[in-house]
């Protein structure tokens, strides 16, 4: 069995220092929370992702994937009836797929409960269909990598 750690455990620590400490502690992999790398993860570039991959590999670590995908910006949402908000969330998800692939990751964990919770006035089946539509767009992008 291999062990990995989430990088947000090391908030306020440089990525390189986090990798060094995780490797020294015996971890073999890390999961990345995009909001820990940039206040607005939409600003992250493929070059940033490749740099993270290189730093992790330099410490003998594998980047397994991304998690806490929709934490920042906080207005992203996959079940909302607001089509513009959902479209921007899916666009961001596709961006994260490309970053994850550039980091060598293969897993994207769709946590971020505030980005999928339902308001009482929303119909569950409709919200589920909206979420499936948004995630489908992201999955299509993931299939390219």
Name each model-derived stretch.
Residues 1-13:
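Boundary/entry segment of secreted carbohydrate-active catalytic domains
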Residues 33-57, 112-119:
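Glycine-rich, proline-tolerant flexible connector loops at the mouths of alpha/beta enzymes
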Residues 17, 54-62, 75-145:
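Active-site acidic/histidine proton-transfer and metal-coordination neighborhood
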